[in-house]
Protein backbone atom coordinates (compact mmCIF):
# COMPACT_ATOMS: atom_id res chain seq x y z
CA UNK A 1 0.00 0.00 0.00
CA UNK A 2 1.23 3.48 -0.87
CA UNK A 3 1.03 7.10 0.21
CA UNK A 4 0.01 10.10 -1.91
CA UNK A 5 1.09 13.47 -0.60
CA UNK A 6 0.56 16.86 -2.27
CA UNK A 7 1.65 20.32 -1.13
CA UNK A 8 0.69 23.58 -2.84
CA UNK A 9 3.05 26.35 -1.74
CA UNK A 10 1.90 29.92 -2.31
CA UNK A 11 2.08 33.40 -0.90
CA UNK A 12 0.03 33.77 2.29
CA UNK A 13 -3.59 32.70 1.88
CA UNK A 14 -6.07 34.62 4.08
CA UNK A 15 -7.42 32.61 7.00
CA UNK A 16 -11.01 32.95 5.78
CA UNK A 17 -10.15 31.03 2.58
CA UNK A 18 -8.07 28.20 4.03
CA UNK A 19 -10.75 26.01 5.61
CA UNK A 20 -12.96 25.82 2.51
CA UNK A 21 -10.03 25.24 0.17
CA UNK A 22 -8.40 22.42 2.16
CA UNK A 23 -11.78 20.67 2.55
CA UNK A 24 -12.69 21.12 -1.12
CA UNK A 25 -9.32 19.84 -2.31
CA UNK A 26 -9.57 16.75 -0.12
CA UNK A 27 -13.13 16.02 -1.25
CA UNK A 28 -12.14 16.39 -4.92
CA UNK A 29 -9.39 13.78 -4.61
CA UNK A 30 -11.67 11.50 -2.60
CA UNK A 31 -14.23 11.75 -5.40
CA UNK A 32 -11.56 10.99 -8.03
CA UNK A 33 -10.41 7.87 -6.17
CA UNK A 34 -14.00 6.75 -5.72
CA UNK A 35 -14.74 7.18 -9.44
CA UNK A 36 -11.59 5.32 -10.43
CA UNK A 37 -12.18 2.64 -7.78
CA UNK A 38 -8.87 3.33 -6.04
CA UNK A 39 -9.09 2.21 -2.42
CA UNK A 40 -7.34 3.99 0.45
CA UNK A 41 -7.31 3.63 4.24
CA UNK A 42 -7.06 7.21 5.43
CA UNK A 43 -7.23 10.72 4.00
CA UNK A 44 -6.80 14.17 5.48
CA UNK A 45 -5.87 17.74 4.61
CA UNK A 46 -3.84 20.43 6.35
CA UNK A 47 -2.99 24.07 5.83
CA UNK A 48 -0.65 26.78 6.99
CA UNK A 49 -0.75 30.35 5.67
CA UNK A 50 1.58 29.29 2.82
CA UNK A 51 0.89 25.58 2.40
CA UNK A 52 -2.19 23.62 1.32
CA UNK A 53 -1.69 19.88 1.81
CA UNK A 54 -3.60 16.64 1.15
CA UNK A 55 -2.50 13.21 2.34
CA UNK A 56 -3.83 9.77 1.37
CA UNK A 57 -2.53 6.66 3.12
CA UNK A 58 -2.92 2.99 2.23
CA UNK A 59 -3.53 3.59 -1.48
CA UNK A 60 -3.54 0.76 -3.99
CA UNK A 61 -0.51 0.89 -6.29
CA UNK A 62 -2.59 -0.25 -9.23
CA UNK A 63 -6.20 -0.83 -10.14
CA UNK A 64 -7.89 -3.27 -12.48
CA UNK A 65 -10.12 -1.52 -14.95
CA UNK A 66 -13.04 -3.86 -15.48
CA UNK A 67 -14.07 -5.03 -18.93
CA UNK A 68 -16.97 -3.05 -20.34
CA UNK A 69 -19.12 -2.86 -23.44
CA UNK A 70 -19.05 0.58 -25.02
CA UNK A 71 -21.97 1.65 -27.21
CA UNK A 72 -21.08 3.33 -30.48
CA UNK A 73 -23.06 4.91 -33.32
CA UNK A 74 -25.98 3.37 -35.20
CA UNK A 75 -24.91 0.93 -37.92
CA UNK A 76 -26.50 3.30 -40.46
CA UNK A 77 -24.71 6.37 -39.10
CA UNK A 78 -22.47 8.43 -41.43
CA UNK A 79 -19.00 6.97 -41.94
CA UNK A 80 -17.43 10.02 -40.25
CA UNK A 81 -19.32 9.28 -37.03
CA UNK A 82 -18.12 5.67 -37.08
CA UNK A 83 -14.52 6.75 -37.79
CA UNK A 84 -14.70 9.20 -34.89
CA UNK A 85 -15.79 6.41 -32.55
CA UNK A 86 -12.93 4.21 -33.76
CA UNK A 87 -10.38 6.99 -33.23
CA UNK A 88 -11.60 7.88 -29.74
CA UNK A 89 -11.25 4.25 -28.64
CA UNK A 90 -8.07 3.59 -30.68
CA UNK A 91 -9.52 0.52 -32.40
CA UNK A 92 -10.15 -0.83 -35.92
CA UNK A 93 -13.57 -1.49 -37.42
CA UNK A 94 -12.93 -5.23 -37.15
CA UNK A 95 -13.08 -4.83 -33.35
CA UNK A 96 -16.71 -3.71 -33.52
CA UNK A 97 -19.72 -5.93 -33.11
CA UNK A 98 -23.33 -5.24 -33.99
CA UNK A 99 -26.11 -5.52 -31.49
CA UNK A 100 -29.84 -4.84 -31.72
CA UNK A 101 -31.33 -2.87 -28.86
CA UNK A 102 -34.63 -1.09 -28.31
CA UNK A 103 -33.58 1.97 -30.34
CA UNK A 104 -32.20 0.02 -33.28
CA UNK A 105 -28.99 -1.72 -34.33
CA UNK A 106 -25.76 -0.21 -33.03
CA UNK A 107 -22.04 -0.84 -33.07
CA UNK A 108 -20.49 -1.92 -29.78
CA UNK A 109 -16.92 -2.36 -28.64
CA UNK A 110 -15.89 -4.79 -25.91
CA UNK A 111 -13.19 -3.04 -23.95
CA UNK A 112 -11.04 -5.66 -22.17
CA UNK A 113 -10.01 -5.37 -18.54
CA UNK A 114 -6.56 -3.95 -17.87
CA UNK A 115 -4.32 -2.91 -15.00
CA UNK A 116 -3.52 0.78 -14.52
CA UNK A 117 -0.80 2.15 -12.26
CA UNK A 118 -2.18 4.64 -9.74
CA UNK A 119 0.80 6.96 -10.29
CA UNK A 120 -0.10 7.27 -13.99
CA UNK A 121 -3.71 7.96 -13.16
CA UNK A 122 -2.69 10.67 -10.68
CA UNK A 123 -0.40 12.35 -13.20
CA UNK A 124 -3.30 12.47 -15.66
CA UNK A 125 -6.09 13.58 -13.33
CA UNK A 126 -4.43 15.66 -10.57
CA UNK A 127 -4.12 18.76 -12.81
CA UNK A 128 -7.85 18.49 -13.59
CA UNK A 129 -8.67 18.31 -9.88
CA UNK A 130 -6.56 21.42 -9.18
CA UNK A 131 -8.15 23.28 -12.07
CA UNK A 132 -11.61 22.74 -10.58
CA UNK A 133 -10.67 24.14 -7.16
CA UNK A 134 -12.80 27.24 -6.61
CA UNK A 135 -11.91 30.21 -4.42
CA UNK A 136 -14.34 32.74 -2.95
CA UNK A 137 -11.77 35.34 -3.94
CA UNK A 138 -8.94 34.76 -6.39
CA UNK A 139 -6.39 36.68 -8.41
CA UNK A 140 -4.16 36.50 -11.46
CA UNK A 141 -0.54 37.63 -11.44
CA UNK A 142 2.19 38.23 -13.98
CA UNK A 143 1.36 36.89 -17.42
CA UNK A 144 -0.13 33.64 -16.07
CA UNK A 145 -3.68 32.50 -16.78
CA UNK A 146 -4.12 30.75 -13.43
CA UNK A 147 -6.68 32.05 -10.93
CA UNK A 148 -5.59 31.30 -7.35
CA UNK A 149 -6.15 32.84 -3.91
CA UNK A 150 -2.55 34.09 -3.89
CA UNK A 151 0.38 33.53 -6.29
CA UNK A 152 1.15 29.79 -6.43
CA UNK A 153 4.91 29.15 -6.28
CA UNK A 154 5.43 25.37 -6.31
CA UNK A 155 3.74 21.97 -6.24
CA UNK A 156 5.24 19.06 -4.33
CA UNK A 157 3.61 15.77 -5.36
CA UNK A 158 4.81 12.35 -4.20
CA UNK A 159 3.33 8.87 -4.61
CA UNK A 160 4.95 5.78 -3.08
CA UNK A 161 8.17 7.74 -2.49
CA UNK A 162 8.39 8.86 -6.13
CA UNK A 163 7.89 12.32 -7.53
CA UNK A 164 4.81 12.75 -9.71
CA UNK A 165 5.44 14.42 -13.04
CA UNK A 166 2.69 16.70 -14.33
CA UNK A 167 2.24 20.31 -15.34
CA UNK A 168 -0.31 22.68 -13.86
CA UNK A 169 -0.40 25.94 -15.79
CA UNK A 170 3.11 27.47 -15.46
CA UNK A 171 4.32 25.01 -12.80
CA UNK A 172 5.82 21.52 -13.01
CA UNK A 173 5.58 19.20 -10.02
CA UNK A 174 8.59 17.89 -8.11
CA UNK A 175 9.47 16.29 -4.78
CA UNK A 176 10.90 19.56 -3.39
CA UNK A 177 9.41 22.53 -1.59
CA UNK A 178 10.52 25.82 -0.12
CA UNK A 179 11.50 25.30 3.51
CA UNK A 180 11.45 28.98 4.46
CA UNK A 181 8.79 31.33 3.11
CA UNK A 182 11.15 34.29 3.58
CA UNK A 183 14.05 32.71 1.68
CA UNK A 184 12.76 30.95 -1.42
CA UNK A 185 16.21 29.76 -2.47
CA UNK A 186 16.11 27.23 0.38
CA UNK A 187 14.53 24.00 -0.87
CA UNK A 188 14.49 20.40 0.34
CA UNK A 189 13.54 17.01 -1.13
CA UNK A 190 10.85 14.96 0.61
CA UNK A 191 9.94 11.36 -0.20
CA UNK A 192 7.13 10.92 2.31
CA UNK A 193 4.87 12.89 4.61
CA UNK A 194 6.49 11.62 7.82
CA UNK A 195 9.89 13.15 7.02
CA UNK A 196 8.14 16.33 5.82
CA UNK A 197 6.17 16.70 9.05
CA UNK A 198 9.21 15.97 11.26
CA UNK A 199 11.39 18.46 9.39
CA UNK A 200 8.94 21.31 9.83
CA UNK A 201 8.24 20.36 13.45
CA UNK A 202 11.97 20.67 14.14
CA UNK A 203 11.80 24.10 12.51
CA UNK A 204 9.00 25.09 14.89
CA UNK A 205 6.28 24.91 12.24
CA UNK A 206 3.12 22.93 13.04
CA UNK A 207 1.76 21.71 9.68
CA UNK A 208 -1.47 20.25 11.09
CA UNK A 209 -3.91 23.11 11.77
CA UNK A 210 -5.76 20.93 14.32
CA UNK A 211 -2.55 20.44 16.32
CA UNK A 212 -1.82 24.18 16.07
CA UNK A 213 -5.22 24.91 17.56
CA UNK A 214 -4.66 22.37 20.35
CA UNK A 215 -1.25 23.91 21.07
CA UNK A 216 -2.75 27.41 21.39
CA UNK A 217 -5.53 26.16 23.69
CA UNK A 218 -3.03 24.37 25.96
CA UNK A 219 -0.82 27.47 26.13
CA UNK A 220 -3.87 29.55 27.03
CA UNK A 221 -4.69 27.10 29.83
CA UNK A 222 -1.13 27.25 31.20
CA UNK A 223 -1.15 31.05 31.21
CA UNK A 224 -4.65 31.17 32.72
CA UNK A 225 -3.61 28.92 35.60
CA UNK A 226 -0.36 30.77 36.18
CA UNK A 227 -1.86 34.27 36.07
CA UNK A 228 -5.13 33.27 37.76
CA UNK A 229 -7.33 34.93 35.16
CA UNK A 230 -9.97 33.76 32.67
CA UNK A 231 -9.58 33.84 28.89
CA UNK A 232 -12.91 34.21 27.15
CA UNK A 233 -13.74 31.31 24.84
CA UNK A 234 -14.14 32.51 21.25
CA UNK A 235 -13.87 29.58 18.85
CA UNK A 236 -14.31 31.72 15.73
CA UNK A 237 -11.37 33.95 16.66
CA UNK A 238 -9.33 30.93 17.78
CA UNK A 239 -9.86 29.22 14.40
CA UNK A 240 -8.93 32.42 12.58
CA UNK A 241 -5.65 32.99 14.42
CA UNK A 242 -4.83 29.28 14.01
CA UNK A 243 -4.89 29.80 10.24
CA UNK A 244 -2.93 33.07 10.43
CA UNK A 245 0.12 31.51 12.11
CA UNK A 246 2.33 28.45 11.56
CA UNK A 247 4.69 28.88 14.54
CA UNK A 248 2.29 29.97 17.30
CA UNK A 249 3.82 31.85 20.22
CA UNK A 250 1.57 33.29 22.92
CA UNK A 251 2.49 36.73 24.28
CA UNK A 252 1.06 38.36 27.41
CA UNK A 253 0.63 42.07 26.74
CA UNK A 254 -0.75 45.02 28.72
CA UNK A 255 -2.48 48.33 28.11
CA UNK A 256 -2.77 51.32 30.45
CA UNK A 257 -5.26 50.73 33.27
CA UNK A 258 -6.90 54.10 32.54
CA UNK A 259 -8.66 52.48 29.57
CA UNK A 260 -10.57 50.18 31.95
CA UNK A 261 -13.00 53.09 32.36
CA UNK A 262 -14.25 52.30 28.86
CA UNK A 263 -17.21 49.86 28.83
CA UNK A 264 -16.14 46.23 28.74
CA UNK A 265 -18.02 45.60 25.48
CA UNK A 266 -16.04 48.30 23.66
CA UNK A 267 -12.74 46.95 24.99
CA UNK A 268 -13.63 43.43 23.87
CA UNK A 269 -14.70 44.37 20.34
CA UNK A 270 -11.64 46.62 19.92
CA UNK A 271 -9.28 43.79 20.85
CA UNK A 272 -11.06 40.81 19.29
CA UNK A 273 -12.54 42.24 16.10
CA UNK A 274 -9.94 44.80 15.13
CA UNK A 275 -6.71 43.23 16.41
CA UNK A 276 -7.40 39.48 16.86
CA UNK A 277 -6.36 39.70 20.52
CA UNK A 278 -7.77 37.69 23.43
CA UNK A 279 -8.93 39.79 26.41
CA UNK A 280 -8.64 38.40 29.94
CA UNK A 281 -10.96 38.59 32.95
CA UNK A 282 -10.60 38.15 36.69
CA UNK A 283 -12.57 35.54 38.64
CA UNK A 284 -15.46 37.99 39.07
CA UNK A 285 -15.76 38.48 35.30
CA UNK A 286 -14.20 41.95 35.25
CA UNK A 287 -11.96 42.66 32.27
CA UNK A 288 -8.27 43.20 33.06
CA UNK A 289 -5.66 45.32 31.31
CA UNK A 290 -3.80 42.20 30.15
CA UNK A 291 -4.49 40.50 26.82
CA UNK A 292 -3.02 37.64 24.82
CA UNK A 293 -1.54 37.83 21.34
CA UNK A 294 -0.94 34.75 19.17
CA UNK A 295 2.27 35.73 17.37
CA UNK A 296 3.82 33.87 14.46
CA UNK A 297 7.35 33.77 15.85
CA UNK A 298 9.51 33.86 18.95
CA UNK A 299 9.81 37.32 20.46
CA UNK A 300 13.36 37.16 21.81
CA UNK A 301 13.87 40.94 21.69
CA UNK A 302 10.36 41.84 22.90
CA UNK A 303 9.63 43.90 19.80
CA UNK A 304 6.46 41.98 18.86
CA UNK A 305 5.02 42.50 22.36
CA UNK A 306 5.91 46.19 22.33
CA UNK A 307 4.45 46.68 18.86
CA UNK A 308 1.13 45.09 19.79
CA UNK A 309 0.89 47.11 23.00
CA UNK A 310 1.43 50.33 21.04
CA UNK A 311 -1.23 49.35 18.52
CA UNK A 312 -3.85 48.54 21.15
CA UNK A 313 -3.09 51.76 23.06
CA UNK A 314 -3.76 53.74 19.88
CA UNK A 315 -6.97 51.81 19.23
CA UNK A 316 -8.19 52.30 22.79
CA UNK A 317 -7.32 56.01 22.73
CA UNK A 318 -9.62 56.38 19.73
CA UNK A 319 -12.32 54.30 21.42
CA UNK A 320 -12.06 56.40 24.59
CA UNK A 321 -12.32 59.63 22.61
CA UNK A 322 -15.51 58.57 20.83
CA UNK A 323 -16.98 57.13 24.02
CA UNK A 324 -16.45 60.39 25.90
CA UNK A 325 -17.83 62.33 22.95
CA UNK A 326 -20.97 60.20 22.86
CA UNK A 327 -21.48 60.60 26.61
CA UNK A 328 -21.37 64.38 26.28
CA UNK A 329 -24.17 64.45 23.72
CA UNK A 330 -27.75 64.53 24.93
CA UNK A 331 -30.23 62.21 23.24
Model-derived features: positions:
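Catalytic nucleotidyl-transfer cores of nucleotide-processing enzymes
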Residues: 231-331
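Long, basic N-terminal domains or extensions that often function
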Residues: 2-273, 281
Amino acid sequence: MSEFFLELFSEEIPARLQCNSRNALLESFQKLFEEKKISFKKSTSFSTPNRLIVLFEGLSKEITQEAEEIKGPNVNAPEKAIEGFLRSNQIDKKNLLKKKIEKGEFYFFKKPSKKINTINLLEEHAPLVLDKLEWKKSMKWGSYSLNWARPLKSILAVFDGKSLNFKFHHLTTSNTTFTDKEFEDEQKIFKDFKSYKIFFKQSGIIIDHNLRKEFIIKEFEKISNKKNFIIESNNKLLSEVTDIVEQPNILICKFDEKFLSIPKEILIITMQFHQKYFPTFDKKGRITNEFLVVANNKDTEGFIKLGNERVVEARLSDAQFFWEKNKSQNL
